Amino acid sequence: SDGEPVGYETLNREAASRRAADDGLFFVPFQGYAGQKRFSKASFIGMDLSHDRFHMARAIMEGIVFQVVWMMEAFRSKPSSDGLKLAGGASKSPLWCQITADISGLPVRVPAVADLACVGAAILAGVGTGIYQNAEEGYKHLAIDERVIMPDPERSAEYRRLLPAYKRSVQALGD
């Protein structure tokens, strides 16, 4: 039944079958930006009875990436021409990786190592003991394999069209 728990693979497969920001469904992961009158909690915007938990799962993935891209714009952050690195829980979802590439319009590099925190600790230990001059040298020395997810031009264009609507929705919540 619809209320039964589903596994990660099913969740990703079903969320992938839903359209981008389906009928204006957005998820705002948090709020609290400069100029906002008050802080509010995470919310879904545009949800109606046609949306199911898989629409919501996709909206959560999209909302988090929309927020990251918006923050990059706000800080005028220019990612490397190599693209973005994605690690941790989101990197385990092929759909989330693709959504990240599509919304950002950049290649997404996903390290083959499951737990980069441990790798980071090892690199910093190497820097601390003088094995590496800096963290970048340590990372390059380890030569961690990466898979690269390229943005789909059509979906990227659709997300570029949706980003202003997402921003307006978030700002309206703060009023």
Regions found by a protein language model. Give the residues of each.
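A broad structural signal for alpha-helix termini and local helix breaks/kinks
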Residues: S1-D2, P79, S104, T129
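Acidic, glycine/GT-rich loop-and beta-edge segments that sit at the periphery of enzyme/chaperone cores
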Residues: S1-V6, G130-D175
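A short helix-loop
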Residues: S1-Y33, E136-Y139
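Short, mixed-charge aromatic SLiMs
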Residues: R13-D23, L95, L142-E154
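Activation-segment/catalytic-loop signature of the eukaryotic protein kinase fold
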Residues: A16-V113
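Glycine-rich phosphate-binding/hydrolytic loop that grips phosphoryl groups
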Residues: R58, E62, Q98, A112-H141
